Amino acid sequence: MKNFHLLEQFIPNAAVQRVNSLLKSHPVNIRITGRRASKYGDFRALPDEHFHAITINHDLNPYSFLITFLHELAHLLTWKNHQNNVSPHGKEWKMHFKHLMHPFIEEHIFPDDVKHALLHYMSDPAASSCSSPSLIKSLRNHDKRKKGILLDELAAGSTFRMVDNKNFLFRKGEKARKRYKCFDLNSRREYWVSGLAEIVPVQETLGI
């Protein structure tokens, strides 16, 4: 893997040796990308090229970056064994992801709060770590620069904009399971927004 030295900058120091060993066993091209609101990373099977490819967002903290890398590397191993004949996040992928993650958890690579949430998430890993509120919140504790707050943290009735889409001006409403009914003051329409969405509070200016 020709760009491992670039990858070293983004992962915890304690993980460098093991990640290097994984990449020697499973060569893949890794490309660091800009922020993508819809995903942290992805795996691309490129059978006509020498290496397959993994892309990972540049703005993740080291622990989020490492989890994303292992998530995508599990896709590589699943593809090598099954190509497109199994579900992307089915039992085969879960098996590889658990196997890859286990030594990093055992070697205390992650802080205690992240490790605790990660152990719960890894009991049955989902397609995205965003599906685990406790994991998302623990990982945010280690962000150097937070772009906003979580919708869960905003008081009911407050107004806000999304971090990645400033076109809407929402008022936070009632909660149903993991989402809030939010009213867009511009379009006068209602939307259901995840409590884990990153938002920026907005102070309303009231006319007299």
Question: What is each PLM-predicted segment?
Answer:
Residues 67-80:
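Active-site recognition of the HExxH zinc-binding catalytic motif
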Residues 2-48, 53, 59-62, 82-208:
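Metalloprotease/metallohydrolase-associated module, dominated by Zn2+-dependent proteases
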